[in-house]
Amino acid sequence: IFSFKRKNKKDPTLYSVRLLPIGGFCAMAGENEEDATDLKLKKNQYMCNRSKWERFLILIAGVTNNIILALIILFFQGLIWGSTEQKSIVGNAPEGYPVSEAGIEVGDVVTKVNGYKVNTWDKLTIVLNLKHKEDTYTFTVKKQNGDIKEYKITPKTVKAEDGTETKVFGIGASSEVHKGFFNAIKYSFVKLGSIVSSMWLTLASLFTGKLSLNNLAGPVGMYSIVGETMKVGLVNVLYLTAYLSINLAVINALPFPAFDGGRVFFILIEWIRGKKIDQKVEGYIHMIGFALLMLLMLYITFQDILRLFK
């Protein structure tokens, strides 16, 4: 839409506002040696001519800032509105549902589901949504008296108007709210660890086929999610912002071409080899990675649009 430079001549950075407000980016001068052609800049101002440490710090800055932003948001969420229990302690098990009928009670702690270790509600939710060949789920539970018991639970299947089916277990977290400055600090870090752990499990499950790509949401799907979230209050919008910021950090840290993590991976190879990788080769690899990401994004967006018309 428009761009500008600061009046300070020592700062040649070009700032711009783009047509689609879907995120921010930094385009460093001379990211590749072939791009280092601007004669107005000194050689040491090109990124490709900076030391390995400097390039490494620049590349992890985005991920680091995403994490810091999420921690700040989660802290203020916990400080102002308080936080609920993050550990996988059963806080709600209504009668007439599979979990309570199996014998699991409020206060029990779910430690495993189908062999997956769970210690937070975020991870428990992910595990319950993974593909499972059998109808029965195995819950390993630590009872309030310290005993460890296993329960075989078959969830109810509820069919929505659009034909989609949802598995219902009848289990929930405690609604008790904890407040206070130090509790807010604890909540922000515990929640960060919980979301990161759940994100890694999600990515691993996508590669192994235990989670379908149809479970992912693209720009169109996120627009709908944000719209629905705004209807239920500011606290949920803030949490969603922190959640997305952490997700972006995790994805960007992956050692995949075109991601910052992929570029860091090439710096690590450079450290090991003692010399730079051919810039053309690295450029082609990042180009292929970017093309694959665009294909994935198109597929996910197509699925988002199909869901809108169901």
How should these model regions be labeled?
Residues S3-R6, I89-E95, L268-Y284:
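Membrane interface segments of multi-pass transport proteins and intramembrane proteases
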Residues A27, N66, A70, L74, ...:
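Alpha-helical transmembrane segments of multi-pass membrane proteins
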Residues Y299-K310:
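Juxtamembrane boundary at the C-terminal end of a transmembrane helix
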Residues L211-L216, A253-F259:
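Short helix-coil transition sites and intra-membrane helix breaks within transmembrane domains
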Residues R6, E31-W53, I58-A61, N65-L211, ...:
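PDZ peptide-recognition modules
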